[in-house]
Amino acid sequence: MENRFKSVFDIIGPVMIGPSSSHTAGAVAIGREGNKLFGGIPKKVTVHYYGSFAQTHRGHGTDYAIAAGILGFTTSDLRVPKAPEIARKRGVDIRFVEEKGESPIHHPNTAILDMTDGHKKVQLAGCSIGGGAIEIRRLVIHDIVVEPSGTLPIVLFIDPERKIKNQRSLTSFLQQKAPFNESRIYKSPDYYIYEYDMQNYFKSSLIGELKKKYKNIVCL
């Protein structure tokens, strides 16, 4: 069986505000990945809960945790419990929906975030797997469904030029700078999306170099 935890700290969980590493810290992490994918704070978010998230989100602080992550807060930020109020004051509309039936990504702690600013729309489907750790199992960008292996970190390159040479260049860059386990390409008439399941998180300097060299890069 594949080990989803990289260290004992992934099992214990992070320093956090809230009652549960799975339902609070993990939910903050899902919200933060939504913020990264969107490229900032969206104007409207609909959060679809499945499984135990749908049953216990109010009591376990999942709502304010998701909102905090969307605002870019960390798990230890003292503002986490007040995140829904802060979001409202910033003009961010966040709604929570309890869905019935099985999770589309097959995990009991599932949150699917539909995010928009009135022009751009993206979707992120994540699950909390314990100890504050999460997986991102599905993304929808420009109506293209992207299905990573789940484990973070993930690099996405959204290519409106639809040129394979761009993928080759990025692949060569990553092979030299940062190893990855798998890569995939997703195509539509308007965009190509290249997705890489990375082995390790980047240093901030490398993220800066990557974003300078390639436009439309997303590092989750």
Task: Give short role names for the model-derived ranges.
Residues E85-C127:
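C-terminal edge-of-domain segments
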Residues M1-V8, G39-K43:
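Acidic-glycine-rich active-site phosphate/pyrophosphate-binding loop
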Residues T46, Y50-F96:
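A structural-propensity feature for long, helix-poor, extended segments
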Residues F96, A125-L220:
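A conserved regulatory-domain signal marking ACT and ACT-like small-molecule sensing domains
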Residues G13-E33:
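Conserved phosphate/anionic-ligand binding catalytic regions in large, soluble enzymes, centered on
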Residues L37-Y49, T74, P81, E102, ...:
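Non-transmembrane, aqueous-exposed alpha-helical and coiled segments at domain scale
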Residues I12-S20, V47-S52, G69, P153-D159:
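Short glycine-rich or small-residue beta-strand-to-loop segments that form or flank ligand, phosphate
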